[in-house]
């Protein structure tokens, strides 16, 4: 007979699963113990745990990020603690990424900007928070919040959209 060439992993796995384990006990071993039933189930339990470990290792490998970064791709700076990255700009215009302290979100002026964003995009908006106004208008609101002014009316009018 010709020897089959190929993987021997099937034979190795079956030997590992069905190998007999010896329990070293001092003293008397019962003939009809419940441990014999456990020994019969052990190969299946071994196979199950081996499959679970194999699945976990594949998941870990698939969730790792690739080290490849395209040449023209610029990685975004990480957001510092206590800040949130938002995008300022019109839908069709150029959006700017701005880091805003989280404390600003409680301010009434910023609340008005968020209400405008809700009217424009709604709650089911994919991506980050986008404020639909000009970048210069947003900078004015940001400086007013930083200076401590709590006026609810915009100096340039009610709407910050074009």
Swiss-Prot record:
Pfam families: Auxin_inducible (PF02519). InterPro entries: SAUR_fam. Acts a positive regulator of leaf senescence and may mediate auxin-induced leaf senescence. Plays a role in the regulation of seed germination by gibberellins and abscisic acid (ABA). Plays a role in the regulation of light-dependent hypocotyl elongation. Disruption phenotype: Increased leaf size and delayed senescence. The keyword Oxidoreductase does not apply. Expressed in embryo, endosperm, growing hypocotyls and shoot apical meristems. The keyword Ribosomal protein does not apply. GO terms for biological process: auxin-activated signaling pathway; positive regulation of leaf senescence; regulation of seed germination. Keywords: Auxin signaling pathway, Developmental protein, Growth regulation. Induction: By senescence. Induced by auxin. Down-regulated by gibberellin. This is Auxin-responsive protein SAUR36. GO terms for cellular component: nucleus. It comes from Arabidopsis thaliana (Mouse-ear cress). The gene is SAUR36. Belongs to the ARG7 family.
